[in-house]
Structures are given as structure tokens and as C-alpha cells.
């Protein structure tokens, strides 16, 4: 990820954050925030499903641009969700950086060990 990419995500997140106290009649994002957890999370599920369907379409000769568009929708709604739970893209980027260089198997083993320690085991 380039600095420009990270900057784009952070700028978009700032705009989303600014909608938290906005008028739900004037802003789609404000409306999602106003509706609460279930509306935000339902939107994530819908967008994730659309990503899966678009990916399957690409394998059948569909347009890759449709998949990119659906992923953009999912990322956008994930940014809304992060903001809704008082998190930011920087939190996700930090976690990805922490995992960088670890194999998926190693990362999963470390996560399980941490969970056991947190649960007193």
C-alpha cells in the first residue's frame, strides 16, 4: 500500500466520521449511523455477498470492473462500520502490518495461543 492509498482511506474515513452527527435525511452515511448496529452490519453482509457473486461472474466471463466496483462498495461500508465502532483504517493497517511476514498458519497459531492466555488457559 502506498502512502497515497493510505491517505485516500484516511481522507474517506474523515468524511465518514464527519457524518456521525449529520442529518439522516441529507446523508446516506448519517442515515446508516442513525439506524444503528443492525443496519450497518446488514449492509456489510449485503455488500460481501455482492462481492462473492461478482467474483463468480468474472470466472464466467463477467467484467472485472464490476468486481472492483463491488469491492469498493464493501470497503466503503467497512469504513462506515469501523467509524460506527470508533475505529479507523489506521487500526486495520496496523494489524496488517503486525501480521506482515507471518504465514497464515503461524498467525492463526499465535492468535489461538493469545486467546487461551486471555481466557486463563
Swiss-Prot record:
The keyword Acetylation belongs to this UniProt entry's keyword annotation: no
SUPFAM superfamilies associated with the record: all-alpha NTP pyrophosphatases (SSF101386)
Disulfide bridges in this chain: none
Domain of life: Bacteria
Catalytic activity: 1-(5-phospho-beta-D-ribosyl)-ATP + H2O = 1-(5-phospho-beta-D-ribosyl)-5'-AMP + diphosphate + H(+)
An example Gene Ontology biological process: L-histidine biosynthetic process
Principal localisation: cytoplasm
Pfam hit, one: PRA-PH
GO CC annotation, single: cytoplasm
Cellular location(s): Cytoplasm
Gene Ontology molecular function: any one: ATP binding
This protein's pathway: Amino-acid biosynthesis; L-histidine biosynthesis; L-histidine from 5-phospho-alpha-D-ribose 1-diphosphate: step 2/9
Keyword line: Amino-acid biosynthesis, ATP-binding, Cytoplasm, Histidine biosynthesis, Hydrolase, Nucleotide-binding
EC number: 3.6.1.31
Family label: Belongs to the PRA-PH family.
Protein name: Phosphoribosyl-ATP pyrophosphatase
